[in-house]
Amino acid sequence: MNKCAIILAAGQGTRIKSKLPKVLHKACGKEMVNHVIDAMRNAEIEDVNVIIGKGAELVKERTTSRNVSYSLQAEQLGTGHAVKCAKDFLEGKTGVVAIFTGDAPLIKPETVKNLVDTHINEKNSATLLTSVIENPTGYGRIVRNGESVEKIVEHKDCNEQEIKIQEVNAGMYCFDIESLLTSLEQLSNDNAQGEYYLTDVIEILKKENKKVGAMITDFEETLGVNSRAELAKVESIMRNRINRTHLDNGVTIIDPLNTYIEPEVVIGKDTIIYPGNVIEGKTVIGEDCILYPNSRINNSTIGNGVEIQSSVILDSKIGDETTVGPFAYVRPESNIGEHVRIGDFVEIKKSTIGNNTKVSHLTYIGDAEVGERCNFGCGTVVVNYDGKKKHKTIIGDDSFIGCNTNLVSPVEVKDNTYIAAGSTITKEVPEGSLAIARAKQQNIEGWVERKKLK
């Protein structure tokens, strides 16, 4: 059976009060519409069409990497009108189409798959996704005749019996494509709002004695976002869901309510995460790590047995058994080896640090290639920028860099060298040598007494 999907993403979302189209607001680091697109793909639906309207070009820009097609809804004239705008996408297709909203990022792939499978197995013309809730005020009620759906009744139109129904319409559907296209031609906007409603398709199908079914799911999954408060609620649920998955997989999260982990993060078992950590993007963290409070890690790979304290690591790689922090800053394109010490107030930028090297405190290393088993004294600075462009520094294995050393790039320090504290190095340091580049100390006896006399 051929399957495709339509995602409704044309609205501006006035209640969210933003210049950004509503569906591009992020939940746990990913645009809401991309959460929904990914749910379709993970439910084995590859052919996805996004209905765009307000901010169309920006929505295209933010979703283009997901290889979807687009249909333009120039005027927002209701959900039925939105689907009519996808007529060119649907025509010529056979099979089924799932229709979901781009502002409901909590929908699970397994729910999408179950809805489509239910629709196909029951041979329905339409299948609604529904939820049973304690307080259904404001929601359209699902009126059933046995297992079949008889109609959807809006809250304001309910009679005494219908108002008691707790099963409500989630606004997400699966349709037989041929039945949907035929019904869309019959849609009318003869209502107070002058809009075309997708729910009216259900009424049209029932009049034609077509079979309409429903599948109940957790109401939480169907929550839509119309305001910043609702976005915060949805994101809180998503964070809890993400953290629970890691807990179930053997990760210790000491305070899940105060730990932010984005959905594509991978964490190995027996890793311990303290409160206040922010782990973003496609970060991969190994086993047996300890993340002490208040670090940010973005799009980085962290090895096994790594300890990180109150530090920032961006787009970089940290090797096994390395310690970072407190208050270290590892900037993009850095590659830190195994058993390395990156200490307090150390900044590493676009550099490679070899295994067993120690950079313990108050040091800047930029655009450098550092060998193995090196030691950096406090206050070392790699002077990589000449005011116009950056230059590279190479430091060989087993080198000892004394405190308050300036390495003026481009420069190379060969293997097994020592640099005296306070030196400013501008030339190559040969292998096995000691480099001293500082003014000779001069003591002026009696100077203080003479200074006082003046």
Swiss-Prot record:
Say where the protein is mainly found.
cytoplasm
Alphabetical UniProt keywords: Acyltransferase, Cell shape, Cell wall biogenesis/degradation, Cytoplasm, Magnesium, Metal-binding, Multifunctional enzyme, Nucleotidyltransferase, Peptidoglycan synthesis, Repeat, Transferase
Q: Which reaction does it catalyse?
A: alpha-D-glucosamine 1-phosphate + acetyl-CoA = N-acetyl-alpha-D-glucosamine 1-phosphate + CoA + H(+); N-acetyl-alpha-D-glucosamine 1-phosphate + UTP + H(+) = UDP-N-acetyl-alpha-D-glucosamine + diphosphate
List ligand-binding residues for UDP-N-acetyl-alpha-D-glucosamine: 8-11, 22, 73, 78-79, 140, 154, 169, 226, 331, 349, 364, 375
Cofactor note from UniProt? Binds 1 Mg(2+) ion per subunit.
Asked if the Swiss-Prot or TrEMBL record annotates the protein with the keyword Cytoplasm, the reply is: yes
Among InterPro entries, the record links this protein to: Bifunctional_GlmU, GlmU-like, GlmU_C_LbH, Hexapep, NTP_transferase_dom, Nucleotide-diphossugar_trans, Trimer_LpxA-like_sf
Q: Which residue ranges does the record annotate as region Linker? A: 229-249
Record region (N-acetyltransferase):
250-454
Where along the chain is acetyl-CoA bound?
384-385, 421, 438
Q: Where do the segments described as Pyrophosphorylase lie?
A: 1-228
Show the GO cellular component annotation of the record.
Answer: cytoplasm; membrane
Active site annotated at which positions? Answer: 361 (proton acceptor)
Instruction: Give the matching Pfam families.
Output: Hexapep, NTP_transferase
State the compartments where it is located: Cytoplasm
Q: In which pathway does it act?
A: Nucleotide-sugar biosynthesis; UDP-N-acetyl-alpha-D-glucosamine biosynthesis; N-acetyl-alpha-D-glucosamine 1-phosphate from alpha-D-glucosamine 6-phosphate (route II): step 2/2; Nucleotide-sugar biosynthesis; UDP-N-acetyl-alpha-D-glucosamine biosynthesis; UDP-N-acetyl-alpha-D-glucosamine from N-acetyl-alpha-D-glucosamine 1-phosphate: step 1/1; Bacterial outer membrane biogenesis; LPS lipid A biosynthesis
Binding annotation for Mg(2+): 103, 226
UniProt subunit comment: Homotrimer.
Which family would the database say this protein is a member of?
In the N-terminal section; belongs to the N-acetylglucosamine-1-phosphate uridyltransferase family. In the C-terminal section; belongs to the transferase hexapeptide repeat family.
Q: What is this protein called?
A: Bifunctional protein GlmU
Gene that specifies this protein? glmU
